[in-house]
Swiss-Prot record:
InterPro entries reported for this sequence: Epimerase_deHydtase, NAD(P)-bd_dom_sf, NAD(P)_dehydrat-like
Signal sequence region: none
Organism listed in the record: Vitis vinifera
Tissue specificity statement from the Swiss-Prot or TrEMBL entry: Expressed in seeds, grape skins, flowers and leaves.
Protein name: Anthocyanidin reductase ((2S)-flavan-3-ol-forming)
Gene3D superfamilies reported in the protein's UniProt record: NAD(P)-binding Rossmann-like Domain (3.40.50.720)
Positions annotated to bind NADP(+): T18, G19, F20, V21, K48, V87, A88, T89, P90, Y168
Function: Produces the terminal flavan-3-ol monomers required for the formation of proanthocyanidins or condensed tannins in leaves and flowers, as well as in the skin and seeds of developing berries. Catalyzes the double reduction of anthocyanidins, producing a mixture of (2S,3S)- and (2S,3R)-flavan-3-ols.
One Pfam family in the UniProt entry: Epimerase
Gene behind the chain: ANR
Domain of life: Eukaryota
Family statement drawn from the similarity comment of this UniProt entry: Belongs to the NAD(P)-dependent epimerase/dehydratase family. Dihydroflavonol-4-reductase subfamily.
Further remark: Hyperbolic binding of NADPH and NADP(+) to the free enzyme, with a single binding site each. The most likely enzymatic mechanism is sequential ordered Bi-Uni-Uni-Bi, with NADPH binding first and NADP(+) released last. This enzyme is strictly pro-S stereospecific and the reaction mechanism involves two hydride transfers from two distinct NADPH molecules.
Amino acid sequence: MATQHPIGKKTACVVGGTGFVASLLVKLLLQKGYAVNTTVRDPDNQKKVSHLLELQELGDLKIFRADLTDELSFEAPIAGCDFVFHVATPVHFASEDPENDMIKPAIQGVVNVMKACTRAKSVKRVILTSSAAAVTINQLDGTGLVVDEKNWTDIEFLTSAKPPTWGYPASKTLAEKAAWKFAEENNIDLITVIPTLMAGSSLTSDVPSSIGLAMSLITGNEFLINGMKGMQMLSGSVSIAHVEDVCRAHIFVAEKESASGRYICCAANTSVPELAKFLSKRYPQYKVPTDFGDFPPKSKLIISSEKLVKEGFSFKYGIEEIYDESVEYFKAKGLLQN
């Protein structure tokens, strides 16, 4: 059978292996000695899977064709796995119809993967990648607010006010809620990891949109700078983590028997003006804008990773290291001058 790996090795399935987070997660799992099954929509798409084929040199990696809309396509990749990491999610920021382009497929994808997990008797734990967008969006006022795993994004506000790109936070919130409902009803050991905006470098051939967004103040991309401002206005802060720490957190909560529930993964909380000031000082060679007029200079909230840290996790990267690596990555990609 295609799914058989050497006996005695822990086996993990990573759903959506071509993505920014998933591909690095595959790499770290292989480096830890796991046998890995990963799913992709089209294994014949060389551009999308070439970095995964290169990772096969690191260890026992099998690539499967699977589609989030097809429940049965996950049976083979999940069979025999100890852990299942569901990282894939549909993203169409410019969608005219978020309900059908993002929200319904995200919920359906989560349920389809979890149904396959219930049939595979080997699965000990399912780890779902959620998003800070499922936690932070609310109509709370004031500054100095702290949000943690108890908080959920206000879906009624999103679906009635429909702020720009509302479909993404709505899809992440509703997909995570659907996962918890299914896990409870079917006795699945589920953990969700809730990352903030991620930066660093990527194994994928395309530059991930989140690194582009994080780097916008340095590249001067006005459209993306407005995206950062929109993020601060909608979610209350600009919060960031290194993609490697996010992947390490996924593996940490999978392996930690006492882990349960939701875990926010956030290394630093800031605002657009504060971040611009920091970047302008650290990288004076780039023309980082620092005048934002009457735009709110401070974030209204802090996204807390206290629960993850108390569990025993330590972050490798602070905001300095996150941006140093992102700058080097953009230089290597020819997107920044030296």
